[in-house]
Amino acid sequence: MNPLILSMIMATIILGTLIVMTSSHWLMVWIGFEMNMLAILPVLMKKYNPRSMEAATKYFLTQATASMLLMLAITINLIYSGQWSTANPLNPTTSIIMTLALAMKLGLSPFHFWVPEVTQGIQLSSGLILLTWQKLAPMSILYQISPAINMDLLLSMSLMSVAIGGWGGLNQTQLRKIMAYSSIAHMGWMTAVMTYNPTMALLNLIIYILLTTTTFMTFMLNSTTTTLSLSHTWNKTPLLTTTILILMLSLGGLPPLSGFLPKWMIIQELTKNDSIITPTIMAITALLNLYFYMRLTYSTSLTMFPSVNNMKMKWQFNSMKQTTHLPPLIVLSTLILPMSPMLMLLE
């Protein structure tokens, strides 16, 4: 893609998200979502092939349906209140429809089916944008309407998302699908605490984006998309491959890595609010995520796949890609846990 066109498209994606996050008018929020959706379609189709075309079509149909539901909710709210302001309290019907629309945009269960399929059909760089930046706009609106959200609806979707995010990733060998199911599970954790403590949900979103960005960047550096190709990177960049495995354990939520912090804080917040069954179920289903990450770590580090002799010479060829941005990201993605007392004071 032409760099000038790509920069214009990326600027439109950023502008659309910022419009959603800063608007106090519901129509401008909807326009921001539409700008963002239409601008990201060329990014998804950056590598022109049938898989990317199919992925972009699935993404468009899902997001268009979600936008239609969002406009329906905005219209009902306008009929009831006569105001376009986002600061105006929502009535229960509007709140339910808007929550469903945002859940579809985020990929929460039972609207999660598009996330693994779309992520698998696009490039790693496009997948990074899809699973990180594209979560900001819906989460910001969810944050704004959090006092009016139907708690039972959101908690049920959260529990289903955590469970499906764990079950779905168990049988996968494609790294992009594993990251997609991990994203579904993380969204479930964030939305579970949204009605109790929205600020904590945003803090967890930041940690999730940090972990996912670092993992995707290491995949892009090694050009790895499957478990098999990940195991072959030992010959080329052994230190970076070790880092990838630690990052995956962090994404799975294994202490004392950074990924354990969001789960710890969310379980603590839910138990403070006399919710015992929900965090118990979430903690048990989180073991599924940890299991498939540990299995992936085991299969790539402790077992060697068959490889031809010329694979053993990969270490002689240095990568020309810049890696200066990776060390600080890796440190933050693995060693944030000691900062937890300070982060808890910020709430």
UniProtKB/Swiss-Prot annotation:
Keywords from the UniProt entry = Electron transport, Membrane, Mitochondrion, Mitochondrion inner membrane, NAD, Respiratory chain, Translocase, Transmembrane, Transmembrane helix, Transport, Ubiquinone
Enzyme Commission number(s) of this protein: 7.1.1.2
User: What's a BP term from Gene Ontology annotated to this protein?
Assistant: mitochondrial electron transport, NADH to ubiquinone
**Membrane-topology descriptor:** Multi-pass membrane protein
InterPro entries, per database record: Complex_I_Subunit_2 (IPR050175), NADH_DH_su2_C (IPR010933), NADH_UbQ_OxRdtase_chain2 (IPR003917), ND/Mrp_TM (IPR001750)
Q: How does it assemble?
A: Core subunit of respiratory chain NADH dehydrogenase (Complex I) which is composed of 45 different subunits. Interacts with TMEM242.
**Protein name as catalogued:** NADH-ubiquinone oxidoreductase chain 2
Organism equals Syconycteris australis
